[in-house]
């Protein structure tokens, strides 16, 4: 192999196109395809935002008390086979055979003629009688066959009528059952309508109270680990965003420490899964349609955050109390950094009613540092 060809292959090896980053993961910190995504999910090493996956349990998705499934009963159809039994009677007719026996022509023709004629006449009369009997028997057999057929027809017609009656009764029973089911469904629908008319006020207010309590719990606890800048709680219906809680801190150091601590904790009987998130701006990650109208036509197919907000008074009180607590912490830290004489003068001035110039100057210095 030539050195030039080897160098060209090495150049081609290192000049491959870089992996394409997943825009949804970079912008929202979650992707519908997860690890199976064809694009690159670049996890940040340092970030001000952490993701608490599926921490919020949305009652509208998990509680089945307010949803009634319309069950469709399976109807079994029965098919009745009508079989008509036809009796075939085989009649055996009698066949008469007439044997003509030859007579010897002797010299006594005149004597035997009368006897023969009489015998022939008697035989003919007997044969005629036998044929008459045969005809009569044959006619009687035909009549019997016809009678049997007619009786079979009558029986078959009666069976068909009975089957028709049974079928009609079955259809009537099915129709009555269907009518009963329809009436029950109508009653259930009416009950659902009345329940829906009664439930929304309760469910909306109760769910908002529950969410406010949840928001307050996580805000108070996480604010002890670092100063919170913003929180976004997702109420999406898809799996990769449902219940996700995004917490943005004032500093990346606070986010890093909070991430380590939260991964060791439990909430509501379940372990907390925390991770650094690449989300830098919640406004870009939020669904504008859901934010403006609290509704999204894409529903579960939407890959942007459907953020649920707490009550305004609770949110304001939480952020105000956090700001106050961190201001007091900063004051304590500043007091530790002040020189000894200023600290002693500030302590004595707190006891005095009128105060002096040293105390005023120390407080002014603290306020300037805070600003």
Curated annotation (Swiss-Prot):
Tree of life domain: Eukaryota
One GO location term (cellular component): U2AF complex
InterPro entries: Nucleotide-bd_a/b_plait_sf, RBD_domain_sf, RRM_dom, RRM_dom_euk, U2AF_small, Znf_CCCH
SUPFAM superfamilies, sorted: RNA-binding domain, RBD
Keywords of the record: Cell adhesion, Metal-binding, Nucleus, Repeat, Transcription, Transcription regulation, Zinc, Zinc-finger
Polar residues bias (residue ranges): 94-107, 355-371
Protein's job: Transcription factor required for yeast cell adherence to silicone substrate.
Designated name of the protein: Transcriptional regulator of yeast form adherence 2
Organism whose genome encodes this protein: Candida albicans (strain SC5314 / ATCC MYA-2876) (Yeast)
């Amino acid at each position: 192999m030539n050195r030039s060809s080897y160098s060209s292959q090495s150049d081609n090896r290192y000049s491959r196109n870089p992996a394409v980053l997943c825009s949804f993961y970079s912008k929202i910190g979650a992707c519908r395809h997860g690890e199976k995504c064809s694009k690159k999910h670049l996890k940040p090493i340092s970030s001000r935002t952490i993701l608490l996956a599926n921490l919020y349990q949305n009652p509208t998705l998990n509680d089945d008390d307010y949803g009634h499934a319309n069950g469709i009963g399976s109807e079994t159809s029965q098919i009745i086979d009508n079989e008509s039994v036809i009796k075939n009677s085989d009649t055996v007719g009698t066949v008469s055979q007439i044997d003509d026996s030859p007579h010897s022509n002797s010299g006594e023709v005149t004597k035997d003629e009368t006897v023969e004629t009489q015998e022939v006449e008697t035989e003919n009369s007997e044969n005629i009688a036998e044929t008459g009997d045969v005809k009569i028997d044959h006619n009687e057999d035909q009549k019997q066959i016809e009678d049997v057929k007619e009786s079979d027809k009558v029986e078959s017609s009666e069976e068909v009528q009975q089957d028709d009656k049974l079928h009609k009764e079955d259809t009537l029973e099915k129709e009555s059952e269907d009518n009963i089911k329809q009436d029950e469904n109508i009653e259930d629908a009416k009950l659902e309508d009345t329940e829906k008319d009664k439930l929304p006020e309760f469910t909306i207010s109760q769910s908002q109270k529950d969410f406010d309590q949840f928001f307050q719990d996580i805000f108070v606890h996480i604010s002890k680990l670092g100063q919170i800048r913003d929180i976004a709680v997702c109420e999406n219906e898809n799996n990769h965003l449902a219940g996700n809680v995004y917490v943005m801190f004032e500093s990346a150091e606070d986010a890093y420490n909070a991430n380590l601590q939260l991964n060791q904790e439990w909430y509501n009987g379940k372990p907390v899964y925390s991770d650094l998130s690449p989300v830098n701006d919640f406004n870009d990650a939020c669904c504008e349609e859901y934010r403006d109208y609290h509704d999204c036509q894409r529903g579960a197919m939407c890959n942007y955050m459907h953020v649920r907000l707490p009550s305004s008074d609770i949110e304001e009180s939480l952020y105000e109390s956090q700001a106050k607590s961190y201001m007091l912490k900063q004051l304590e830290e500043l007091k530790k950094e002040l020189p000894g004489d200023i600290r002693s003068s500030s302590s004595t001035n707190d006891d005095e009613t009128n105060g002096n110039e040293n105390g005023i100057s120390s407080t002014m210095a603290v306020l300037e540092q805070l600003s």
